Amino acid sequence: MFVDQVKISLKAGDGGNGITAYRREKYVPFGGPAGGDGGIGASVVFEVDEGLRTLLDFRYQRHFKAKKGENGQSSNMHGRNAEDLVLKVPPGTIIKSVESEEVLADLVEDGQRAIVARGGRGGRGNSRFATPRNPAPDFSENGEPGEELEVTLELKLLADVGLVGFPSVGKSTLLSIVSKAKPKIGAYHFTTIKPNLGVVSTPDHRSFVMADLPGLIEGASDGVGLGHQFLRHVERTKVIVHMIDMSGSEGRNPLDDYKIINQELINYKQRLEDRPQIIVANKMDLPDSQGNLSHFKEQLDNDVTVVPVSTITRDNIDQLLYQIADKLEEVKDVDFSVEEDENLGVNRVLYKHTPSADKFTISRDDDGAYVVSGNAIERMFKMTDFNSDPAVRRFARQMRSMGIDDALRERGCSNGDIVRILGGEFEFVE
């Protein structure tokens, strides 16, 4: 089964908790604090595996949770860092945030990695808070929560050649006779409902990867038919092979077919207009094909390549393969992905998901309580041990330093009012 788009949820590992401990040894009076830090939580890492061709594995498992870092120990021993959770994806995978729709990673090369959900840092043990004024602090920090987000994985096939055209023009038949691929072939429209890849070898021992894409129809760039679902696979092909039924056996005009498909490619992504294209006039064994071909060529520029073939009789197939291989050699040094990234407004390779740090918002619940939310304050809340009075006092100082107390006063919060953070309730005290 071919799967090229899936939504999954990721949870990076929380950092291990720091601990509160003291040095207790014979002949060492006033040994002082000795609580170790927690280990770093595991990150969720995506890695390209060139042996994969589909996102099928993610269809059956859609929730991924990385391991937590170990807690700190006494004698200033730090907890062990958790091992990253590595998820293998095929080349050409784009990772997008569901919430913001921004591109987090674009992975194209074998072994390429991207950290999409970063593990939390370990909480600090009490020895890290020792100061001359407080040489024996009796509080420590919980581990930082790991990042949690939903992402969409999209696969854009990395094929050298993409076969495009209306349904039933012979794309799957061509792929089946020039490679060992076995696409489904039938005498009805949309027999191909998923892309098929095949490795093609020419008689002079040159090879390339060809993708048979499902048939396009007018309006495909707007999602009509299979639309956007498979048009994106054309984006990374180096050469477009545009197949046309020159016999007009479906009752359509070959020239109209050519113009409609080209317009759909242009409408979908403007840069495809300049992508190298070879026109294949198929079904030349049928009546009216020669006359239609002559009229077709008269309407095109002289520099447009048109190769007449018959996938049934296999006439001129080798000549077509030579033409494709020659065109690929002409553009072998052109990186079409760079052009793609410029249009997307991002740089290829990898991106880091970084929530905004110090911003917070204040709202009111129906019962009149004030609700404070924001990445930084929620992270500090989770890292605070509320069973420790010194840790609670430190949390209150952090809220004041962030300006939350002043912001609450500006919103009308007064002595004794309830303030909520992530379900925890506090009483505002002047």
Swiss-Prot record:
Keywords, A to Z, come to: Cytoplasm, GTP-binding, Hydrolase, Magnesium, Metal-binding, Nucleotide-binding
Protein name as annotated: GTPase Obg
Q: Which organism is it from?
A: Staphylococcus epidermidis (strain ATCC 35984 / DSM 28319 / BCRC 17069 / CCUG 31568 / BM 3577 / RP62A)
Assembly, in brief, is: Monomer.
Record region (Disordered): 118-145
Q: What is its main location?
A: cytoplasm
| OBG-type G domain boundaries | 159-329
Show the Gene3D superfamilies listed in the entry. Answer: GTP-binding protein OBG, C-terminal domain (3.30.300.350), GTP1/OBG domain (2.70.210.12), P-loop containing nucleotide triphosphate hydrolases (3.40.50.300)
Give the UniProt family note. Belongs to the TRAFAC class OBG-HflX-like GTPase superfamily. OBG GTPase family.
Which Pfam families does this one have?
DUF1967, GTP1_OBG, MMR_HSR1
The record's section on PROSITE patterns has: G_OBG, GTP1_OBG, OBG, OCT
- A biological-process GO annotation: ribosome biogenesis
